[in-house]
A protein has these predicted regions:
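Ser/Thr-rich, low-complexity intrinsically disordered terminal regions
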Residues: 2-185
Length: 185
């Protein structure tokens, strides 16, 4: 039998969650707003080639099964900019008799140049259990930041807001990895 030790933080505190969700996973811009960014090269592709790939992907995002009212809000082929206004569901858990999900709204902006893609996810806002006493509407800064969505020791996800942080990071990772893979082909 092999015994493996639980992963720990530098302070020696045992981790209760995957490190990808812990301290520093949610980034803030200079204005203190939650903002996720990705920059990638595109295997030598021109700005026009990258634009077409990204436009097709971002158009497809608006047709996703969890889509509520997402749309491509801005296209500028000359400047190589595409912006989506996203409105979709993040499903936390689902069974035959229950569904736990939140509506998330955000902007997804792609800035493209030759051999380069910069993607930004910003202005995140949640609408949870609308019309119920346990429901709320709030910006990501009050829901998924380190101070709010992590335990005091920062070694796990907080009970209430941890699921929002995990769901948001998973969605961001999915979009960023899929689009990076497409432009690098």
């Amino acid at each position: 039998m092999i015994l493996t030790e639980s992963p720990k933080l530098a302070s020696g505190v045992k981790l209760k969650a995957d490190p990808k969700y812990l301290e520093g996973a949610v980034t803030l811009n200079d204005d203190g707003k939650v903002e996720f960014t990705m920059e990638t090269d595109a295997n030598g592709k021109s700005a026009a080639q990258i634009y077409d790939i990204v436009y097709n992907y971002m158009s497809g995002l608006t047709q996703d099964k969890n889509n509520i009212a997402s749309r491509v809000a801005l296209v500028n082929p000359q400047e190589h900019v595409i912006a989506n206004t996203m409105d979709e569901w993040i499903v936390f858990s689902q069974s035959f008799i229950s569904l736990d999900r939140t509506e998330i709204k955000y902007q997804l902006v792609a800035n493209i140049a030759d051999n380069s893609l910069k993607l930004k996810m910003t202005r995140l806002y949640y609408n949870y259990e609308e019309g119920r006493s346990t429901g709320f509407k709030d910006a990501a800064e009050n829901v998924i930041t380190d101070k709010i969505a992590l335990t005091k020791k920062k070694n796990g996800l907080a009970k209430i807001f941890g699921k929002f942080r995990k769901g948001t990071i998973n969605r961001k990772d999915q979009i960023f990895s899929e689009i990076a893979e497409l432009v690098k082909k």
